[in-house]
Amino acid sequence: MRAVCVVGLGLIGGSVLRAAAAAGRTVWGATTADADAVTAAGFDVLDLDKALKRARKEDAVVVIAVPLPSVDGVLRKIGDFAPRCLLTDVVSVKGPVVEGVARFAPETRFAGGHPMAGKSASGWAASEATLFTGAAWVVTADEDTALDAWREVAELAIDCGAGVVPTTTQEHDAAVARISHLPHVLAAVLAACGADGGPLALSLAAGSFTDGTRVASSRPELVLAMCEGNRAALLEAVDDALGKLGAARGALASTGALSATIRAGHAGRVALDAYRAAGQAQAMIDLTAGDPLEELRLIGAQGGRIVGFDGDLALATLPVLPD
Amino acid sequence: MRAVCVVGLGLIGGSVLRAAAAAGRTVWGATTADADAVTAAGFDVLDLDKALKRARKEDAVVVIAVPLPSVDGVLRKIGDFAPRCLLTDVVSVKGPVVEGVARFAPETRFAGGHPMAGKSASGWAASEATLFTGAAWVVTADEDTALDAWREVAELAIDCGAGVVPTTTQEHDAAVARISHLPHVLAAVLAACGADGGPLALSLAAGSFTDGTRVASSRPELVLAMCEGNRAALLEAVDDALGKLGAARGALASTGALSATIRAGHAGRVALDAYRAAGQAQAMIDLTAGDPLEELRLIGAQGGRIVGFDGDLALATLPVLPD
């Protein structure tokens, strides 16, 4: 099993370090915070240059787990000290990471990653080896992704307990704009509209407002880094929301009828619940035949996951929705 | 203690019947569903005409607890059989109820009500005597509301375990548009935008999307009745949301910066949390001096509640926010 060098040991990076170690891999990390606590937990912490030199020497996979604004700086170091390493990341937005890799570490063998797991607490102290158990973990399969790099990164994600969702950088960013970044923007809009109603409105707020504004309590800096980093895709999602809300406004003003809006929303939520309640079918993809990356992307597009490998076969599960 | 006649014995009406009985009041009801179950639970169920005749004879307070589209029909019956009764309702939107009262039962002594309690299950089977414990319960105090009617309805709400929020019909409808109806519209828009992302997006949806779309799983007919019944106030709230979302769109497209949007939303949610964590100061309102209805409305405008009466004094609590 390939060794793992994790750069950035907050909630996600720390959990990758712990999970990969629990899977039996040799691990070490670099961090700008909590180094003593990581060491006290029994893990090797090196400064970034040394961590990357060791990655080159031991042919480790390097996992970038720093916030997006710090990614390019880490990539420069990788270009200097481990320029041909196997590389992935666990940063939310994928487009800017791909651009940074092309610019600063173009000779690495890269497949981007995004584990869909988290919790409200942050930092090393909140990290845990089981954070990814059962979670979806995107590993990007673009036209120019090397199949062996993709597979090795997918194996790391599976070792950490996750199921792997193969998709492109662009499709990932478009999807998370809709289901992760747009929810933050709409929660902020709703919270501001409610607060504009003054103490009377807040005193009457019940579950619908509480749920709809929950993520507005997240630290603004984190939300901004996430949303602004996915600017182009989020703009499309916001335009979609503006169009739908504008249609609701028009219907309310003209006929007073919100049926199309409310029923489309109900259908959307029912689709989510149906997806989550779906049965699972098994499928296998031969990684030696045809266009395996395209086959893998089709699994992701259908809401499926890669859950393991058997020789040259990738083992997949696909949701089976009731008719 | 005045007897209570509840018309409509679903979740809310059934819970009023149970709570008022538990407070020691004589109660009976009328219902189009579950009459056998209500009787089996030990309560008197009459047909609507007889229930209202008994209300007239025993000088009971009549509580309208039917869905908004059925309110006018009940009001006609009240005009026929108990035209001068003390009257309230527990329907969400207040404007259309006030209009119906003026048209069909203008001689009743009316103060509108809206208990801010509920749960996802509906119907008599879901009702419980403790549903309103600690909840806010709006009792409308308009310019033409009779103080003694307001007080008696408030006493019923307090007997049911709630704290009473005094405000006007118009201010109530504006507030619930922001904190109850707009959340449903935005949840519907978000759910539709997410589902438009297909199975890939649904497979990546985590907490922010799940929370933000939770109320989109409500029965569309109930949501439509609620939202469409509050058309004018909801239109204002939707316009506010459209303006804020449009501003976010413009900022994202021009500078890419969402700071104003995200920080205003964070401040709004912080205001909600601060309100809920606030300490409580006591206040008293002399119902025999000055303009007591205006004093009561000021309590509601400050996020306060009436929690009891002592002779001619109304006892209030007001939130005390940390500086």
What feature does the model see in each segment?
Chain A
Residues 51-86:
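Rossmann-like NAD(P)-binding element
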Residues 5-6, 64, 139:
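Hydrophobic Val/Ile/Leu positions in short beta-strands of Rossmann-like dinucleotide-binding domains
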Residues 131-217:
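Internal alpha-helical scaffold of NAD(P)-dependent oxidoreductase catalytic cores
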Residues 200-273:
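Interdomain hinge/lid region at the active-site interface
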Residues 65-67, 91, 141:
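Glycine-rich, N-terminal phosphate-binding loop of Rossmann-like dinucleotide-binding domains
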Residues 245, 252-254, 258-323:
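NAD(P)-dependent dehydrogenase/reductase Rossmann-like domain
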Residues 1-54:
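NAD(P)+-binding Rossmann beta1-loop-alpha1 motif at the extreme N-terminus of oxidoreductases
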Residues 74-124:
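Rossmann-like NAD(P)(H) cofactor-binding subdomain of soluble oxidoreductases
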